[in-house]
């Protein structure tokens, strides 16, 4: 079985090392980094992953490079780990090199921001492509040294995937067999891809905290940070409360989707419940969203995206962060669009989205161009 991983970032690196612990899996990594590719080509391409208990797992992927034809040759599965804003260009780049003589299972980890719609649009006419996505990353990964080492944080107890509505039961069965072969945690199949699209995650979490840190009336609205801080260990009370409001609105979108489409999306649970089920005893105090975020050991030490203040002392939020370009420009934009079409009211999400677009000034704004124009009517 050959797995091609697109992206040599934290998730791509960690998955490559973990997959190669299984001798029956051929792993190729397609990267845009000429440095990482050259290091592998020189023979010095041993990748490492440091586990939470201090063990070091090592592996050398079978291919690491910038050539999509080499990376995708005879691939059975393609895992896309790039952020949402990079996925359209990537799919266009790899499309000509996908095998045509067998089924190819193309999935995104995680599969949020409407990946099923994006992939179906870019890869239209390719009947052998099976589109799927994973609800969340299987593990937290951080402290990446590109092409060398990454640290592995908390792991999900169970993994959940969904396929595009067009896919067959036979394709679903084949996908599940493949995923349960390459992942240690049990993999479960969801009924509808909207269960992934509406999973409460980064599109709710990071923007809510950003707004509470630097939005209107926030402590750092008009001054830089004195020191680095962590997304979750240092999450302010206001951020947790705003996140709860956004999560309630996401549930309203879920209920409206169920009513309009006649489907069951009950697996889309409130965020606090999702986190408790995902991280269990790694959470020190799960009584409130605030205490949960600050005491989840799987989240400990994850830094907020701060960079040196170009206008003086201190630190400021990095405008190049995925929190803006992925979670807001794609994740929140999609939720706002879905809410409008479903006539669901989402004042907190819309408030953050409008503020972030104004604050940043250079975000892709409006409905992502791959959302079907006739959704939800034609769904």
From Swiss-Prot:
UniProt keywords, alphabetically: Plasmid
Transmembrane segments: none
Domain of life from the UniProt record: Bacteria
GO molecular function annotations of the record: oxidoreductase activity
Keyword Transport attributed: no
Keyword Electron transport annotated: no
Protein name: Uncharacterized protein y4xO
Naturally occurring in which organism (per UniProt): Sinorhizobium fredii (strain NBRC 101917 / NGR234)
């Amino acid at each position: 079985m050959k797995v091609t991983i697109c992206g040599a970032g934290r998730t791509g690196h960690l998955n490559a090392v973990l997959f190669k612990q299984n001798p029956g899996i051929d792993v190729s990594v397609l990267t845009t980094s000429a440095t990482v590719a050259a290091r592998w080509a020189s023979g010095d391409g041993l990748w490492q992953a440091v586990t939470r208990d201090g063990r070091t797992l090592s592996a050398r992927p079978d291919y690491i490079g910038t050539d999509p034809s080499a990376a995708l040759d005879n691939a059975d599965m393609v895992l896309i780990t790039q952020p949402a804003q990079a996925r359209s260009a990537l799919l266009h780049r790899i499309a000509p090199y996908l095998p045509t003589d067998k089924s190819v299972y193309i999935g995104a980890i995680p599969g949020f921001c409407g990946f099923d719609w994006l992939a179906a649009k870019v890869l239209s006419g390719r009947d052998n492509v099976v589109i799927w996505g994973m609800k969340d990353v299987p593990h937290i990964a951080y402290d990446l040294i590109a092409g060398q080492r990454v640290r592995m944080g908390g792991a999900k107890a169970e993994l959940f995937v969904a396929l595009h509505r067009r896919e067959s039961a036979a394709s679903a069965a084949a996908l599940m067999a493949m995923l349960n072969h390459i992942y240690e945690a049990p993999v479960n199949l969801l009924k509808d891809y909207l269960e992934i699209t509406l999973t409460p995650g980064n599109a709710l979490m990071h923007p809510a905290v950003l707004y509470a840190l630097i939005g209107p009336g926030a402590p750092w609205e008009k001054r830089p940070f004195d020191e680095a801080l962590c997304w979750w260990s240092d999450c302010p009370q206001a951020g947790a409360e705003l996140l709860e409001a956004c999560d309630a609105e996401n549930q309203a979108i879920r209920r409206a989707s169920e009513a309009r489409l006649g489907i069951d999306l009950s697996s889309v649970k409130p965020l606090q419940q999702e986190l408790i089920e995902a991280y269990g005893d790694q959470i020190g105090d799960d009584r409130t969203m605030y205490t949960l975020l600050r005491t989840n050991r799987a989240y400990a030490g994850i830094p907020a995206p701060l960079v040196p203040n170009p206008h003086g002392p201190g630190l400021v939020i990095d405008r190049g962060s995925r929190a803006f370009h992925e979670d807001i420009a794609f994740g929140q934009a999609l939720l706002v669009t879905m809410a409008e079409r479903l006539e669901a009211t989402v004042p907190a999400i819309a408030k953050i989205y409008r503020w972030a677009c104004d604050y940043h000034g250079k975000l892709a704004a409006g409905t992502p161009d791959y959302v079907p124009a006739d959704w939800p009517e034609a769904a």
